[in-house]
Regions:
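Core nucleotide-handling region used for phosphoryl-transfer chemistry
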Residues: 1-382
């Protein structure tokens, strides 16, 4: 693998980290540079450009996709691009496995405790075992075999589809599609149907679709199953531009999770802002997480019980009890309410639970994390 200390990555969605790159036009995702002596740098890899997205109501854009037959169309899937980048280091061609945002895909996480690099490697191992069920090679050895099978004159791109943990809307459970390669020297893109991914590891490629008219595109997008696909990806052949036409229902359901990597945090957010329709649609989209949602409700109840017990000890029994500052602010708020009318405003467990419901969801999320930590440390026995 490449020694990463001499490399850095700039993504079009991020700020430029270096003054010498202030004038760089960031049209592509995850541009990888190598630092050279005297504060110089060299671009190592620039793969896919930023992808513009629009729906079927944008008739003008859809009609433009049909002009002069400049585009190739593919079924679009939700997922993350994994890149195998090759570069010369100390006279030897070495590689790195990266995402668009991270030089090391094994350090890239979203919505899961398993990194994108691990997910990618594990799926390759599963693919290998399907064709070689009697193999005794280890996971790491198979991954090394896969990397060694790649042409070092190319950079490779793969789409690792979402799974039930990191999906926004749709999931194909870590299925890998070969998304094409780039020439190391010229950066010319080779579509997946025109180049081999690996002789030893044959990957599927995204389904290519032929459209004759813009209405064909609209008809197709309207019938897309949002649980499987986003819509279509259009790649312009000459200028190498990417566009996605997204199914309306898929687009609407992206709002349910939003860009929130934590399902627990998003659950609390939707619950506490009081949008019942969105909240129940979120639970329906992630209905296989019902045990998690039930646990969240149980944790809120236990949290209320803990806060009430601390309140009783501190303010009724006048016993010193140390609590984390985030708990202190809630206790102080409850006691302020009590002092407004001491005879009427009695701090019961039900009141504490209601006060939690009125608290900002970010604060409740912090309280739950701190409460769980205290439980794990054996400092709370409930």
């Amino acid at each position: 693998m490449l020694e990463l200390s001499n490399y850095f990555i700039i993504d079009s969605t991020d700020n430029k980290p270096r003054k010498d790159l202030e004038n760089l036009e960031l049209t592509n995702r995850g541009i990888i540079f190598k630092s050279l002596p005297d504060d110089n740098h060299k671009m190592v890899a620039s793969t896919f450009p930023y992808t513009e997205e629009f729906g079927i109501n944008n008739i003008v854009e859809i009609e433009n996709l049909m002009i002069k037959n400049e585009y190739s169309f593919y079924k679009s899937y939700e997922g993350t691009i994994i890149r195998v980048i090759h570069d010369e280091q100390e006279g030897v061609i070495k590689r790195l496995v990266a995402t668009h945002k991270k030089l090391d895909a094994f350090e890239s996480y979203w919505g899961s405790y398993v990194s994108y690099g691990e997910l990618f490697q594990n799926e390759i191992y599963s693919m290998f075992l399907k064709h070689n069920p009697d193999s005794e090679l280890s996971n790491d050895k198979v991954f090394e075999l896969f990397l060694d099978s790649l042409d070092t004159s190319l950079h490779y791109t793969f789409l690792l589809t979402s799974n039930d943990e990191n999906k926004i809307v749709s999931s194909l459970n870590n299925k890998i599609f070969f998304a094409g390669s780039f020439d190391r020297e010229t950066n010319k893109y080779n579509p997946p149907e025109t180049t081999n991914s690996s002789q030893l590891f044959p990957f599927d490629i995204p389904e290519q679709i032929n459209f004759k008219t813009s209405q064909d595109i609209i008809d197709y997008i309207e019938k897309v199953d949002y649980k499987e696909s986003q819509g279509i990806l259009a790649i312009q052949k000459d200028e190498f531009k990417l566009f996605k036409v997204i199914n309306d229902e898929y687009s609407r359901k992206t709002l349910l999770r939003g860009n929130n990597s934590s399902l627990i945090h998003r659950y609390l957010q939707l619950k506490f802002i009081g949008d019942d329709q969105m909240f129940f649609e979120f639970m329906d989209l992630f209905n296989y997480k019902i045990q998690l949602f039930q646990q969240i409700e149980s944790d809120i109840q236990n949290l209320a019980l803990y806060i009430h017990s601390v309140y009783y000890a501190r303010y009724i029994e006048k016993t010193f009890v140390y609590v984390n500052p985030v708990f202190h602010s809630v206790l102080k708020s409850i006691h302020y309410w009590h002092n407004m009318d001491k005879r009427k405003n009695i701090t019961t467990l039900k009141v504490v639970y209601q006060k939690l419901q009125e608290t900002d969801y970010n604060t409740v999320y912090k309280l739950m994390k701190e409460y769980k930590k205290l439980c794990e440390e054996g400092k709370i026995l409930l």
